[in-house]
Amino acid sequence: MFEPVIAPSGTLLGLLQRGRGDGTLHALAAPRSEALAALNQCVLRDPRQDWQVENRSLYYARLYLDLDGPLGEIEAHLFGADDLFDEEDHRTGLALSVLGHLASYGRDDALMLLRRYAASGANWAWALDELALRDDDAGLRSLAAPVLARFPATPEGEARLAAAVRDAYEPRPWALWEESPLYAERLRAARQQGSFDRWQRQMTPSGPRPGWGVQAVFDWAADGLRRGTPLHVPAARCLAAVAAPEDRPAILAAAAGACGEAARATALHHLVLAEPENPAVLDLVEAAGDEPAVAAYERMCGPAALDRARLWVHRPDALGAAAAALLAARGGADDAGLVLGALRNTVRGAGPDSVRLFALVDGAGRLSIGCAAPVLRHVYRETASSHLRGRAARALAATDPTFAAGFAVECLWDCEETTREVAARHAETADARVAPRLRRLAADPAEEEDVQSAVRSRITPESAV
């Protein structure tokens, strides 16, 4: 899996990859062939930083509709030779989701492609989930034979079938197929086996047992670390349940590193909640300074942690970043300068895609730091993360007087529903594009309810929208 190559933000391709509203507006104004080429590149080479979190499918599907775009490129991608060897969901997931939205909008060619791919494609389960939401009963029943043929009548095949039934996001196709006398017995057995497997996992936990003490919890955490599965967070919860007052010296010693790395991480995560105002705990966090210690500090939010954050915020390491994030989330007006400085330094040093920016951008908006507007605008334009851009839009709504007449307008076409919601609440209707767009969002059955609620709050009998 390769990292996506993101084009410059001022290009049509770069705008579409980022999912910006200006991407749609520029595509509709560009030559159709150029717009379709950029759109197809985005759909076939997923540009998202985190494909499990960021949204693009509805955004691209709407643009296919506006451009009356053919689906030949998507078809070639789905049924190409790579599909025989690359079974990763990420390769075809975005294209299948786009087809799902197009099918909802009445594009029969998209529906037919989904059916074909569900019958023969490697990522058939994703296509089937899309069809479960959009196809009729007859269409779904026609897929029973090719889908079930994937699972041979062997012990291994039946186990795979039980897992597929158990893990399906949408149970509708499987329920329909179970109604058929041809498949009822086999699918009923698969469903029951899946339920039994789930019950069996719940009944055979591998974690703590009654009667465990502090040392047993530390040993469990150490065993997890040896197996490559850090368990210090659940171990800290166990520690809270089993620790007695007389165990405090042993826990403090473990937090200082006397019992190994896993025990130290477990003890620190326990102490930051058990003794949040104890300066000695913060000293232990600072002395450790590693990832578990920083994660433990991030769970603190009291006055002592804030006081220490004001001292640590200038550090160039992860503890300094955690201190800045805490001030952004919990600090007061007097901390605005520190948050602004951290925001500027992070953009300057790590660029507009740094994960550290999420908390700092939120903090700039929460504290209404007007001086942050220029750097927030830079983050908005340049970041490849649509989630971070949405946070920047919310922060700009609180800090930038020009937001309503500027970025808020293009945000009505953004790929993220939360960003469209912000735009629907703030975009100035003096712009001739705003009123028609609000009406379209209000009438679009694919639009999210929160966005439509925001639109309805703007469409009143007294308004001109």
Show which residues each predicted segment covers.
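Amphipathic alpha-helical scaffolding segments comprising HEAT/armadillo-like alpha-solenoid repeats
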Residues: S9, A35-R45, G69-L84, Y105-R116, ...
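Substrate-recognition/specificity elements adjacent to catalytic centers across diverse enzyme folds
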Residues: G21-H26, A30-R32, L133, A138-W177
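C-terminal structured domain segments
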Residues: L388-L396, A404-E447
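N-terminal nucleotide-handling cores and adjacent loading/scaffold lobes of large enzymes
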Residues: R56-L65, D82-D83, A95-L102
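Generic helix N-cap/helix-start motif at coil->alpha-helix transitions
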Residues: V5-S9, L16-G23, D50-S57, D86-S97, ...
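Charged, amphipathic alpha-helical stretches
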Residues: M1-H77
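Charged, low-complexity intrinsically disordered segments
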Residues: A149-A153, L161, R166, E170-M203, ...
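Core register positions within helices of long alpha-helical scaffolds
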Residues: V98-H101, E130, A164, C238, ...
